[in-house]
Every structure is written in structure tokens, then in C-alpha cells.
From Swiss-Prot:
Pathway: Amino-acid biosynthesis; L-proline biosynthesis; L-glutamate 5-semialdehyde from L-glutamate: step 1/2. Its main location: cytoplasm. GO terms for cellular component: cytosol. The keyword Transmembrane helix does not apply. It is found in: Cytoplasm. This is Glutamate 5-kinase. It is an enzyme of class 2 (transferase). InterPro entries: AceGlu_kinase-like_sf, Asp/Glu/Uridylate_kinase, G5K_ProB, Glu/AcGlu_kinase, Glu_5kinase, Glu_5kinase/COase_Synthase, PUA, PUA-like_sf. Its EC number is 2.7.2.11. It comes from the Bacteria.
């Protein structure tokens, strides 16, 4: 089966629509364009596919309603604009899809919702039930309550995490660019569109020369990283131009040469591992010797204190930490069994020495393999 045929077979879709495609050049939402997008989403639903929308545009709509001509930089001003614009954004999607007798649901998420196991499972169950009922969820970051430390950062990342959450087979990221080019098209007019790439190819990041737009936070780099993240649940990602006519239907028909297809190049992670991988913020880092790093990379074994040479940061038991090899490269991340001060006391020691060092022993491992995801 040609790899684009995976799109024809995909039953569960996440579609991310960028700000440039649904705003009137910064003057609020472009309702005619949104209505046209709703028509395409409705056609996909009519074909029996489940669809989740991740939609930008709340800040741009809020700026219009507040009379602001330039995007603010202060977080509290962005939050105010998002709060004002969010209702208009969801209302516009609701109106467009209601013409096709489709129900929508507003879903606002924060990183904390996905890093807490119970809330993560609740969000997953709610979204899956909406999809089962034929509802089109419209997902966005809950900008009015997040801080810089706990924000997703951009809707490309959020879309990938939602794809993981609902175990989508296809993620479509619609932008104002044709896809990923082999060179920066601003500097090389003869740059060629890449038709198909491996989602985890480390060479892709160097091709991302385009910055984010004025109204959006994401550039091509966030889309490449989002595709890699989505691939953890086996999701195929397409980055394509929303300026193309009937682009969603054409992608669903597996049309070749439309956008860039990011192909998953590893086995999908188990559900719990996907949750672990969804943590964007970490509380500290463990520096490993070569033997421990190799054991994690090649065998996915638990991390024992003896393989740790240094502890960075201040973290509590059960928080997420990064594991780095001697070159400083992340090899894994996981939920640690000991607080930072305890970890500093037992690092480099055999597990049998934990009790004599601390006066007690909680676990023989610093991080158990079930609470760890290898990231290389």
C-alpha cells in the first residue's frame, strides 16, 4: 500500500487550521473562509470519518473586538484577547457546521490537564465519547489561565498531543505554506517541496527556516516537531497549504504531491507511554554514565542509582525528569521515585545501599521502566 493510502483508510482525523487561513489579514475572523472550511469538515464527516478541530484565531478575533492593531507581547494582554475572541471563534465554527446538522463542542486544555494522569484519562474519554456521538470537538489552549511555564506554546504542539490523545490515524496541519521544502524558499526560489519524509528524521529541523507569522506562534519547526510527536501514536501527519482548493477532500483521497507527508518510523507507544511523552515541562535532569544511557537506549531498562553521575534541579517524588547521556543528549524521561535531595545522596550507589544511605528505601530504581519513555 502506498503510504498516502493510509490517509484514505484513516477514520479518525485531527485537523489544525492556522490563523492565517481563518482571519481577515488580522482584522478578526474571516467568516466566509470559516464557512468554507466547515463545508470541507462536513464532507469528511459525511464520509464517515471522525474529526477533531484544533483551531487558531482566538487572539486575532479578540484583537479585532478590542480594537488592537498589533499583537501584544505581554502574556496577560494575550490572555485577555484570547478570552474575548474564543467565544467568537467557537460560535463561528458552530454556525458553519450547524448548516450541515453537525454539533460542535468547545474543549479548552492546559498542559496540566495532560500531565495529570487522571485528568488526561478524563479528557481522552470525553473526546472519544464526543467523536462516537458524531460531535466535532473544537480544541484550543485555555489561554486565559495558563502561564508561560505551563503553556503548550503553539497549536501545532497542541494538535499533535490531541492526535495522541484520541489515537488519530491522520493529523492535517493546514498553513499558508505548501509544506516542507528542501531549502528555505525565501533564500532559494528553486526550493522543492518534499513529498514524503520520516517523522523522526533529525535532519528535518535544519530545513525549517520560516518564522512564525504575525498572528500565529508556530513556524515550520513546530510543525516538524509536532509530526514527530504525533508519530508516537502511529499518526500520519500532513503539512499542507490551506490555499489549495478542497485540500481536505483531496488529502482524504490520497492525492499525491499535495503537502508533505510525515510517515511514522517507529512502533506506536503504548497508551501509558504516550501519556508520559505528552509531558512538555520537566522538573529536573539526571546525568547518566555511558552504561546506563546505553541500557535505556537499547533495552529500555529501569534506571538504577548506580548509573547516575549528577542530579540537576529541584523536584519531588513522582515528578517528570529528563535523563541525559554523557554528551548531554536526552535519551529518556520519566517519573522519578525520589526527590532531588534524596537522588543526590544515592546517585552512583548500588540499590542495596539506598537504605543505609537514606535510612529507608522506597524503590530500588530511581525511575522504573513502566514510568519511563525512551526519547531517542
Amino acid at each position: 500500500m502506498r503510504r498516502r493510502e493510509a490517509l484514505r483508510q484513516a477514520q479518525r482525523w485531527v485537523i489544525k487550521v492556522g490563523s492565517a487561513l481563518i482571519t481577515d489579514d488580522g482584522r478578526g475572523l474571516a467568516h466566509e473562509q470559516m464557512s468554507a472550511w466547515a463545508d470541507q469538515v462536513a464532507a469528511l464527516r459525511k464520509a464517515g470519518r471522525q474529526v477533531t478541530l484544533v483551531s487558531s484565531g482566538a487572539v486575532a478575533e479578540g484583537m479585532q473586538r478590542l480594537g488592537w492593531r498589533s499583537r501584544p507581547r505581554a502574556l496577560y494582554q494575550l490572555q485577555a484577547a484570547a478570552g474575548v475572541g474564543q467565544s467568537g471563534l467557537v460560535h463561528a465554527w458552530s454556525d458553519g457546521l450547524a448548516r450541515h446538522r453537525l454539533q460542535t463542542a468547545q474543549v479548552l486544555l492546559t498542559h496540566d490537564d495532560l500531565s495529570d494522569r487522571r485528568r488526561y484519562l478524563n479528557a481522552r474519554s470525553a473526546l472519544r465519547e464526543m467523536l462516537r456521538l458524531g460531535v466535532v470537538p473544537v480544541v484550543n489552549e485555555n489561554d486565559t489561565v495558563v502561564t508561560d511555564e505551563i503553556r503548550f506554546g503553539d497549536n501545532d504542539t497542541l494538535a499533535a498531543l490531541v492526535a495522541n490523545l484520541v489515537e488519530a490515524e491522520a493529523l492535517v496541519v493546514l498553513t499558508d505554506q505548501p509544506g516542507l521544502m528542501d531549502r528555505d524558499p525565501r533564500e532559494h526560489p528553486d526550493a522543492v517541496l518534499l513529498d514524503e519524509v520520516r517523522a523522526g528524521d533529525p535532519e528535518l529541523e535544519r530545513l525549517c527556516g520560516s518564522p512564525a507569522g504575525v498572528l500565529g506562534r508556530g513556524g515550520m519547526l513546530t510543525k516538524v516537531r509536532g509530526a514527530e510527536r504525533a508519530a508516537r501514536s502511529g499518526t500520519y501527519t500532513v503539512v499542507a497549504s490551506g490555499r489549495e482548493g478542497r485540500v481536505i477532500q483531496r488529502l482524504a483521497d490520497a492525492e499525491p504531491g499535495l503537502g508533505t507527508l510525515f510517515v511514522p518510523d517507529q512502533e506506536p507507544l503504548a497508551a501509558r507511554k504516550q501519556w508520559l511523552a505528552s509531558h512538555l515541562q520537566t522538573r529536573g535532569a539526571l546525568s547518566l554514565d555511558e552504561g546506563a544511557a546505553r541500557a535505556l537506549r537499547e533495552s529500555g531498562k529501569s534506571l538504577l542509582p548506580v548509573g547516575v553521575v549528577a542530579v540537576e534541579g529541584g523536584f519531588s517524588r513522582g515528578e517528570m525528569v529528563v535523563c541525559r547521556d554523557p554528551a548531554g543528549i536526552e535519551v529518556a524521561r520519566g517519573l522519578v521515585n525520589y526527590a532531588a535531595e534524596e537522588a543526590r545522596l544515592i546517585c552512583g550507589r548500588a540499590s542495596r545501599d539506598i537504605e543505609t544511605t537514606l535510612g529507608y528505601v522506597d524503590e530500588p530504581e530511581l525511575i522504573h521502566r513502566d514510568n519511563m519513555v525512551v526519547t531517542v
